[in-house]
Swiss-Prot record:
It is found in: Mitochondrion inner membrane; Mitochondrion outer membrane. The gene is SFXN2. The lineage of its organism: Eukaryota, Metazoa, Chordata, Craniata, Vertebrata. GO terms for cellular component: mitochondrial inner membrane; mitochondrial outer membrane; mitochondrion. This is Sideroflexin-2. Widely expressed, highest levels in kidney, liver, and pancreas. Its main location: mitochondrion. It comes from Homo sapiens (Human).
Length: 322
């Protein structure tokens, strides 16, 4: 039996995005790491199906389940602002496989300076690509800005890790294991604002409820970027804080001392166990489509909105990025 799709809106959220649980379910769906292995052909099919559904011309015999699956693939692989296919490594669905490997090795190889520098560099290279891929595409980023952001974040991460390693030499071993997290958190506070500095300088695009562009707001940009920084730190925090405690205890066991070669793979696997939950939880902390009271915007932009809408538009909306 053919499904009636006349009233189906493919862009309507399946879960209430005003609630934390609804957002977590949404991101659990689109950050599914299995979508990383979907073929280019299937991704292109998903984009065609989504675009046809928006125009109301889906092929006969199409089922709702097919459209929902197409939307899942589309959201996982295509940028929400431009509709362009994102590079695989930069997608949020790659956070689990990519993040678990890097996190596991950062936590394992934290004792020697060359290893600390190398893995912090690898992590910041990965973060820079993720930040660029998931930026608000309405605010263009130059090659110079990307290079400066990458250099600054990498320098910050390495300097933090090296400095704290030196300061914690006489501290309990567990404290030294937490150094990678401190470096990651510090770098996130630098990398994301630097990568998106144009939004802080010129403002982020804000729209009305009907997706009509109103103007650009620096205050909205500051809020969106702050939320992204908090989300990224939250994503890595549980694994990078609790895993050192777990490994500190496990490594004292007799059988673990005999299989030191398995310590790194074990940390990678355990990092994955944390990230499989923390990626959607961290992404869902704040709505991706942010709502901001007009009264919080810059006075000049407030005047523009009041002149155009009167008091009928109490809020503006913008994509904060991921």
């Amino acid at each position: 039996m053919e499904a009636d799709l006349s009233g189906f809106n493919i862009d309507a959220p399946r879960w209430d995005q005003r609630t934390f649980l609804g957002r977590v379910k949404h991101f659990l769906n689109i950050t599914d790491p299995r979508t990383v292995f979907v073929s280019e052909r299937e991704l292109d099919w998903a984009k065609v199906m989504v675009e046809k559904s928006r125009m109301g011309v889906v092929p006969p015999g199409t089922q709702v389940e097919q459209l929902l699956y197409a939307k899942k693939l589309y959201d996982s692989a295509f940028h929400p602002d431009t509709g362009e296919k994102m590079n695989v490594i930069g997608r949020m669905s790659f956070q689990l496989p990519g993040g678990m490997i890097i996190t596991g090795f950062m936590l394992q190889f934290y004792r020697t300076m060359p290893a600390v520098i190398f893995w912090q560099w690898v992590n910041q290279s990965f973060n820079a690509l993720v930040n660029y891929t998931n930026r608000n595409a309405a605010s263009p980023t130059s090659v110079r800005q990307m290079a400066l952001s990458y250099f600054t974040a990498t320098t910050t991460a390495v300097a933090t890790a090296v400095g704290m390693n030196m300061l914690t030499k006489k501290a309990p071993p567990l404290v030294g294991r937490w150094v990678p997290f401190a470096a990651v958190a510090a770098a996130n506070c630098v990398n994301i604002p630097m990568m998106r500095q144009q939004e802080l300088i010129k403002g982020i695009c804000v729209k009305d409820r009907n997706e009509n562009e109103i103007g650009h707001s620096r205050r909205a940009a500051a809020i969106g970027i702050t939320q992204v920084v908090i989300s990224r730190i939250t994503m890595s925090a549980p694994g990078m804080i609790l895993l050192p405690v777990i490994m500190e205890r496990l490594e004292k066991l007799h059988f673990m001392q005999k299989v030191k070669v398995l310590h790194a793979p074990l940390q990678v696997m355990l990092s994955g166990c944390f990230l499989i939950f923390m990626v959607p939880v961290a992404c869902g902390l704040f709505p991706q489509k942010c709502e901001l009271p007009v009264s919080y915007l810059e006075p000049k932009l407030q005047d523009t909105i009041k002149a155009k809408y009167g008091e009928l538009e109490p809020y503006v909306y913008f994509n904060k990025g991921l």
